[in-house]
Amino acid sequence: MICSAKDARYISAAAYEATKSEVQARLGCIAVVSGKIIARGYNHYRTYSKDGLIGMSCSCHAEIDVLRKCLKQNVTKRIVLYIIRISRGGEFLCSMPCNKCFHCMKDFQIKSLIYTDASGNVIKTRFCNFTSDHKSKGELAIIRQNLLSN
């Protein structure tokens, strides 16, 4: 899929959200429904939520932050997610959702995902065509710790 001028504006908004993150992997995310930004978020240190969306994790991922805000507004349909990861120098890095975020997204009717690949290229895809087995650094650290303690 080709990105439009509107997509570029939303990508910029998600990148701005990423600048707010104090986590090593600085990700920002926005949710758009019918051309309107309905939720903004970024990854931050939080390891629990009553809604169950933050599971075994070292942080609240940007996607989950946004989905929690959508849920609070009872918005669960026709959502387009823009997920951007930036370096300290402002360059785009891989922002592909991890497998845990992907599984949480399945509970929503996500229309499309826009994220960046390992080369910083913008990828736009329909959610129904997306899959992820990517593990976040936090999840890998937890797995390593569990293996060491067993």
Q: Which residues make up each language-model segment?
A:
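General secondary-structure propensity
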Residues: 1-3, 28, 37, 48-52
